[in-house]
C-alpha cells in the first residue's frame, strides 16, 4: 500500500505491482485526503487508517476506511489540545489494536481506540516522525527533527535518533543516537522498521540512505 502525497490518495497494490484499489482523491471533506503521510492496516479485519496532512496541509486528522475502501469516520481535528493533531506523521497498531499516532508538530504520541477515543498522550519519545511496533509490543520511534540546546532542531534539549520502549506502559529503555546528531537540517531517520532478528532500520530522507543497526548479543 502506498500513500501518495502529490496525488492525495492511497493506493493498494498486489505483490506483483497490480493496482487493486485507490482510496479517494484530493479534498478536505470527510471522505477525501490532502497530503497523506502514512497508512496502517488492521490485520484482524483489513480496516485502513490514513494519517494526513503534511506540512502546510489542512486536514490534520486520521481517516478510517473499511477493507473495501468505504469511509467509516475521521479521528481528530487540527489543534494542540488532547485528541487534536498537528501533522500526524506516522501510525502503528499494537497487539490490542490500539492506534498510535506520531503527532509530530505537537511533539507527542497520541494513542486512540479504533472507535476514536483518546486513551493516552506520551511525550517521552521526542518528536515522532516514524513509528514501528513489534508483535510483543516493543515500540520504536524515529525522531528526525530534535536537537540540542544550541537551537538546532524543532524540539530542542533532546537529541534526534531512534527511541525504543514499551507500547504497553510507555517506558523508554534504549536510544540509538543519530549518526550526525548536530546537523540542523531535519536529517535524522524519519521511518523505522525492525526485522525478525531484531535489527533496526532507519530511513533517512535528507541524506537519502538506509541505516541498519545490528542487534548486539
Regions of interest found by a model, annotated:
Residues 1-217:
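Sequence-structural signature of mature extracellular/luminal beta-sheet repeat domains
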Amino acid at each position: 500500500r502506498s500513500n501518495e502525497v502529490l496525488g492525495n490518495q492511497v493506493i493498494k497494490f498486489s505483490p506483483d505491482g497490480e493496482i487493486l484499489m485507490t482510496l479517494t482523491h484530493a479534498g478536505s471533506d470527510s471522505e477525501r485526503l490532502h497530503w497523506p503521510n502514512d497508512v496502517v492496516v488492521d490485520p484482524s479485519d483489513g480496516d485502513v487508517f490514513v494519517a494526513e496532512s503534511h506540512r502546510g496541509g489542512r486536514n490534520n486528522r486520521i481517516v478510517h476506511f473499511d477493507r473495501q475502501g468505504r469511509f467509516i469516520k475521521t479521528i481528530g481535528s487540527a489543534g494542540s489540545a488532547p485528541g487534536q493533531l498537528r501533522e500526524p506523521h506516522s501510525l502503528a497498531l499494537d497487539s490490542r489494536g490500539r492506534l498510535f499516532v506520531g503527532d509530530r508538530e505537537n511533539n507527542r504520541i497520541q494513542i486512540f481506540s479504533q472507535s476514536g477515543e483518546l486513551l493516552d498522550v506520551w511525550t517521552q519519545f521526542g518528536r515522532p516522525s516514524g513509528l514501528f511496533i513489534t508483535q510483543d509490543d516493543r515500540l520504536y520511534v524515529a525522531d528526525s527533527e530534535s536537537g540540542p540546546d544550541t537551537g538546532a532542531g524543532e524540539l530542542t534539549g533532546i537529541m534526534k535518533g531512534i527511541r525504543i520502549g514499551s507500547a504497553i506502559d510507555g517506558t523508554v529503555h534504549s536510544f540509538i543516537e543519530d549518526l550526525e546528531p548536530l546537523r540542523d537540517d531535519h536529517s535524522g531517520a524519519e521511518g523505522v522498521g525492525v526485522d525478525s532478528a531484531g535489527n533496526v532500520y532507519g530511513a533517512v530522507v535528507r541524506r537519502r540512505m538506509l541505516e541498519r543497526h545490528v542487534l548486539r548479543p
